[in-house]
Design a protein with these regions (language model features):
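Hydrophobic alpha-helical packing residues
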Residues: 21-22, 106, 202
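Active-site-proximal region of nucleotide-activated glycan assembly enzymes
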Residues: 27, 37, 48, 107-167
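Glycosyltransferases and closely related glycan-assembly transferases
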Residues: 78-92, 99-114, 127-132
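Short amphipathic alpha-helix
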Residues: 10-21
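Donor-nucleotide binding loops and adjacent catalytic segments primarily
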Residues: 36, 41-45, 166-229
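Conserved nucleotide-sugar phosphate-binding/catalytic loop shared by glycosyltransferases and other
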Residues: 2-5, 22-74, 217-219
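Short internal beta-strands
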Residues: 27-33, 137-139, 208-216
Length: 229
């Protein structure tokens, strides 16, 4: 069972692992959140999907923090029900807020729990789960303290991305400069504000250029306004 959700940084590496396991003849089941992109992205694949109701806490304000213990308890109970029904041999937590309830459910069911951290600085969920995990994997060396005994594996990459990386990159000094602004799967508000202003100041130096700005589905209009201003 793969437990991951929230953003593409957790979901797409999980899909890469699921694809490789499928090629090896190993069945997978995905446990995610109804509010994360996995509800759309994983649902569009052949991976069986179960969803629990839980959101991240960092941007929820004091009310969400106040109700957090109840929300986490309910999500853990739901994850436990799914775990008992699916009966996975191993649970792989790839991060995101849903990994907390999923990891605890795996521990309660006495299932081997493997967690993978994609970032140089581990998130809160993986820091907590590292205390009960059977094996801890990290993309960057020394992300976890030495006593965790994490194994550095790098980040899983999907085959379609790897194939693009091996292709020759054709560039030309002629024509306008092409700039890609990428703020992650959900965008980055700070980039959405700073980059348009910076490009406005640098326009005389850069000359003609084209910008493709990945701003996040929820911030399209405010980013358009920033460029117009």
């Amino acid at each position: 069972m793969i437990v991951a959700g929230g953003t593409g940084g957790h979901v797409y590496p999980g899909i890469a692992v699921a694809d490789e396991l499928h090629r090896m003849g190993i069945r997978t089941h995905w446990l995610g959140s109804r509010h994360g992109i996995e509800a759309r992205v994983v649902a569009g694949t052949a991976i069986p999907l179960s969803l629990v109701r839980i959101r991240g806490l960092r941007r929820g304000g004091w009310l969400r923090w106040l109700t957090a213990p109840f929300i986490v308890a309910l999500a853990t109970a739901h994850a436990l029900i799914v775990m008992i029904k699916i009966r996975p041999s191993v649970v792989l937590g790839m991060g995101g807020f849903v990994s907390g309830p999923g990891g605890v459910a795996a521990w309660l069911c006495r299932k081997p729990l493997v967690i993978h951290e994609q970032n140089a600085v581990p998130g809160l969920t993986n820091r907590l789960l590292s205390r009960i995990a059977t094996r801890v994997l990290e993309a960057f060396p020394r992300s976890f303290p030495v006593q965790v005994n994490a194994r550095c594996t790098g980040n899983p990459v999907r085959d379609d991305i790897a194939r693009v990386g091996n292709a020759a990159l054709e560039t030309s000094s002629e024509g306008p400069l092409n700039l890609l602004v990428f703020g992650g799967s959900r965008g980055a508000r700070k980039l959405n504000r700073v980059v348009p202003a910076a490009l406005s100041l640098a326009q005389s130096t850069l000359g003609q250029f084209t910008v493709l700005h990945q701003c996040g589905a929820d911030m399209v209009e405010e980013t358009r306004v920033a460029y117009r201003e």
